[in-house]
Amino acid sequence: MTMVNGFWRWLTADPRHGQITTLGLLLAYGAGGLGFDVSAAQCGVTVATALAVQWLGDGWRGAPRRSGAKSALISSLSLCLLLRTDDLAWAAAGAAIAVGSKFLIRVGGKHVFNPTNGALVALLLLTDAAWVSPGQWGAGAMAGFGFASAGLAVVHRSARSDVTLAFLAGYAALVLARAAWLGDPWAVPVHHLESGAFLLFAFFMISDPKTTPDSRAGRVLFALAVAAGAAWVHFRLFRPNGFLWALACASPFVPVLDRLLPALRYAWPAPIPSSLSLDWRSPMIRRSVVTLLTALALGPGLAPRAEAFCGFYVSRADTSLFNKASQVVLVRDGDRTVITMASDFRGSPREFAMVVPVPTAITREQIHVADAPIVAHLDAYTAPRLVEYYDGNPCAVPSPAAAMDAARAMGAMRQSVAEALKREKSLGVTIEARYTVGEYDILILSATQSSGLETWLRENGYRIPRGASEVLGSYIRQQMRFFVARVNLAEQARLGVATLRPIQVAYESPKFMLPLRLGMVNADGPQELFVYALTRKGRVESTNYRTVKLRTDVEIPAYVKDPAEFTKMYRAAFDRHVADEGGRAVFQEYAWDMAWCDPCAADPLSRDELRQLGVFWLDDAPAGPQPMARRPVAGPQDVFVTRLHVRYDAAHFPEDLVFHETGDRTNFQGRYVLRHAWTGPAACPQATAYYRQVAERHEREAQTLASLTGWSIDEIRARQGASPRPGPEPPDRAPRPVPPPVAWWRQLWKR
């Protein structure tokens, strides 16, 4: 009890103690519970750099060395939570900018920018190698932390809870008003307001008492301005991280508000009781600086390497494993997008119809019909895969080169015309354009009222589900058009096309999204969507739902090699992944440079295939097939592919999918590994230990498969059979001793 009382006294002695505690808990939860891509090395570099720069800044300013340690720790923990980068130098730069800006950018003795916010915005402007993942928290997971933080803000005399409350109220009012104007169900704004990024910003960034106006009236005005700016960035500019941009733009006006509405300036409790000393003689400071210098020196070694994968490719889990599976290829660079839509429609062509909201008007030249085999090739290339290894003779002495290859292998691991026009006008529907492209008749529609559009579509033979009017109305108020396609049977017969081909549309818009909601009206159960994003910079992720990597590089029993078993296993494993995430996640199944693969489930796409999919930035090098590359080729590659798998329904995905491109070029494959044991004779002492390890591995594989799929461990063990045993000795000779290894210098000069 004494320890609890002591901790409570420490927690309530200074508002910063509550922030440090909560940020530390959030970081532990994010890294351990949500699988954030933040390494211990990045956290160590960030914290050490922040403390070191604070120590230097205090000395330069002539302040007590220990005065700013807590603030520096808060800034560094916030950066660990929000900043994503694979380069430790940029992590250090972010911490240096955050803390250094407090000393360098000051007006009237007060630093202008929130340290963490300023550093994040600076890095987003300076490099593609750093990014922020606003969807990493998901929706709902942070609610408990939000309430806890609100309680801490009151109990710990933060004196800035008015900023948080004003921002929360202002932004929530704008989001709810927008939903009411669009006619969206309340699930849409609620999902938006449940975002962990939103709550984290409200409680830990905009509430910084050292960078907000001194007067209460000024703080409320400031918070409302940031809320309005964030809403503008999100809903008018269609850019992620609107909170960060809005706060950065509003911060320079804080000195103006302080001059117009003067009040007593906030000061931390004095004296500041601190166990964090920034005295150079302090062991903590010395350890921090040593950590920083060591991490920077070893950064390239700490960063993950692209190792070769030397297993044998066995099988893949392509889209044919799932019913109701649609495929979309998104080629994106800047605001330019080429979307390829491949439907799994299997009925009569005369029954086919497609209605897709599009963000802008579309001309004939922007529409194309693609070849289905190219999409199938992309699906095969990016599909989760099954690979296998064969153990070598445990009695053989591996050469140094073979040992190195084995280490690498273990490391690496998408009516009349006049009457018709009159009727369209009465329903508020305008046919902006009509085209015939390949085997499709295509209309580009705009509308002024959802009920009129719904009526027009039904009267013209399009089977629109009842209740679609509400969703159509939301898209109409967002000034979106409707891309409507049906099959021209005469053209299909003339072209000799038996299977409907994918439709491609090229357009330019800041909206990087996929409209899902219209397809969920009266949908018969969850639907599968595969998104293949082809980009220049790096991996694509969702900004409004959590993007979760498949569990990969796990060893499973060898009997799963049978294609039917692998199909069954992968379906069950994906079902389990979806359930574990509450049905609200987007799953990353593949992320890799298009120039190579290791192992390859299919050859990389040729330059000509990429151009046909819409990759418009390729240079003018000769087109045609490329040899399959199993190692990265020299120089940067221009096409990075991300495969995302979504199982969606209206209950779990109330909003359309919104994406952004990150600077992350880390290679990732959904990969399952089979290990075949050596079954030869146990002709040496090492074999006894080897077969003991095989028995243990045999059990681990069964446990892993049970964990992945939820299947009964007893049934898995029964299918798996007994652990491999040594084979019989050859009948004509006794076991021979293994000769000692030859000295390396004898091999060198052949003596």
How would you label these PLM feature ranges?
Residues 64-138:
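Membrane-interface helix-loop-helix junctions at boundaries between adjacent transmembrane segments
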Residues 1-58:
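N-terminal signal-anchor module of multipass membrane proteins
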Residues 307, 311-321, 408-412, 464-704, ...:
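Accessory, solvent-exposed terminal regions and/or long lumenal/extracellular loops of proteins
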Residues 362-437, 446, 621-626:
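A cross-kingdom signal targeting lumenal/periplasmic-facing segments of multi-pass membrane
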Residues 127-184:
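Internal active-site segments that recognize and position negatively charged phosphoryl groups
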Residues 4-22, 175-278:
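C-terminal transmembrane helix-loop-helix hairpin of multi-pass membrane proteins
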Residues 331-394, 453-474, 479:
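Surface-exposed, glycine/proline- and aromatic-rich loop segments on solvent-exposed faces
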Residues 5-6, 52-64, 97-111, 149-159, ...:
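C-terminal ends of transmembrane helices
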